[in-house]
Regions:
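Membrane-embedded hairpin module used as a gating/binding unit in multi-pass transport
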Residues: 165-239
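Transmembrane helical segments that form the transport core of multi-pass membrane transport proteins
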Residues: 210-295
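Hydrophobic transmembrane alpha-helices of multi-pass solute/ion transporters
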Residues: 2-16, 37-38, 50-78, 233-259, ...
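Alpha-helical membrane segments and immediately flanking helix-loop junctions
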Residues: 71-76, 85-90, 104-115, 119, ...
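Intrinsically disordered, low-complexity non-transmembrane regions of multi-pass membrane transporters
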Residues: 1-16, 22, 176-205, 239-245, ...
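Structural signature of hydrophobic alpha-helical transmembrane segments
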Residues: 12-24, 68-83, 129-137, 164, ...
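Entry/N-cap segments of selected transmembrane alpha helices
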Residues: 93-117, 268-295, 346, 350
Length: 371
């Protein structure tokens, strides 16, 4: 009786297994370790890590049920948009509406997008890929995935890994830059919080107004901003509590799980282990640093023009990583003076950064698509 076919079937997985697959499985294990042990952005790094392992044992996004998930949620941009609905339902824009000048910091915090775009072009990346890499500077995973899936789907895996990894490393990357760019005297500046009252009507009208205004200015950003704002409208209307809680919990959690698995499933050894991936990861770090530096410099400028009434630390909050960046700036201020509370100011800048990242990503998508 010839059992060679049985032996061939039993060893099929081993014969197609390469050293590259082993390395990528190790990468997946590292991502899972960072999620479990260090608790770095665990809701995303854990499924991305497991998806990476799956991709290198024959369950990539090219075949089987992972292809169904990838096609349904990544190619259609559904998962990033569902996540934005959940994020919008979590965000309180009242600190920003009470301090409209914080919008300036949200704009300054997007400098890394365009600075990294230019750097990627200098390194030889075509415009569509350079733009996708630049959007890592939004420090906003859903925006990076949304733009990347349209402009450079082949680079989606390293772009997503870079965006979420650096977002989780905010407490490690930002503090040295913040201390280097500001003096102790600046970090000790106390900011009075005497906000103008924000009415319920304003909170309800705001998401509607922003959706219309941004969609007219940057039509390609319309899906992102509409998803973010419908989530916020659920929160602020106070009449659909079940939908608001569902957006904040079940919807965003399920979308995040499947998005992480789908992105991880694209991390096959043959497409991930190359110099280009290392360059993307390096450029992503540069984008993050440029965002922080630009925000701090603008914060220092606002400090000068306000007569020393604005703590420059809040400039580092003008990125999309909500609420981590805001909390970090507040903690840095309290390390110098335990009674220095700048949290609400920092949150105002942080929510401005969330809006700024969506608008900047949409404008970039529109400009590149038009060329």
């Amino acid at each position: 009786m010839d059992l060679s076919f049985l032996l061939e079937e039993l060893t099929r997985g081993f014969t197609s297994f390469t050293w590259g697959n082993a390395v990528m499985i190790l990468v997946g294990v590292v991502l899972i370790t960072l999620a479990v042990v260090k608790e770095y952005e665990p809701v995303l790094l854990l499924p991305i890590g497991f998806g990476c392992i799956m991709a290198n044992i024959g369950m990539s996004a090219d075949t089987g049920f992972m292809k169904v998930i990838y096609d349904a949620g990544i190619k259609t941009e559904l998962f990033p948009l569902l996540i934005f609905v959940g994020v919008g339902a979590m965000i309180d824009f009242s600190p920003l509406l009470a301090q409209p000048k914080m919008v300036l910091l949200g704009a300054a915090g997007q400098f890394g997008i365009y600075g990294t775009l230019l750097l990627a072009l200098l390194l030889g990346f075509p415009l569509n890929e350079a733009a996708s890499i630049g959007v890592i500077g939004a420090i906003d995973g859903p925006t990076a995935i949304f733009v990347g899936s349209k402009l450079a789907p082949d680079l989606l895996a390293p772009i997503a890994v870079a965006a979420y990894s650096y977002m989780s490393l905010i407490p490690i990357i930002q503090p040295p830059i913040m201390k280097l760019m500001t003096t102790r005297k600046e970090r000790l500046i106390r900011m009075e919080y005497t906000p103008r009252p924000v009415s319920r009507l304003t909170l309800v009208v705001f998401p509607i107004f922003v959706t219309v205004a941004v969609s007219l200015v940057a039509p390609d950003a319309a899906p992102l901003i509409a998803s973010l704002m419908v989530g916020n409208l659920l929160r602020e209307s106070l009449v659909v509590d079940r939908l608001s809680k569902a957006a904040q919990n079940e919807i965003i959690n399920i979308a995040t799980l499947f998005l992480g698995l789908a992105i991880g499933a694209t991390m096959k050894a043959e497409s991930f282990l190359n110099l280009q991936t290392l360059m993307i990861l390096g450029l992503g770090l540069i984008a993050f640093i440029l965002d922080t530096v630009a925000g701090l410099l603008f914060g220092k400028l606002m400090c000068v023009f306000s007569g020393g009434k604005i703590n420059p630390l809040i400039g580092a909050c003008g990125i999309s990583a909500f609420p981590m960046a805001g909390r970090l700036a507040a903690r840095m201020a309290q390390e110098e003076d335990f009674e220095n509370f700048i949290l609400m100011h920092a949150m105002g800048a942080n929510t401005a950064g969330q809006l700024g990242s969506v608008i900047a990503g949409g404008l970039l998508l529109a400009l590149v698509s038009a060329l």
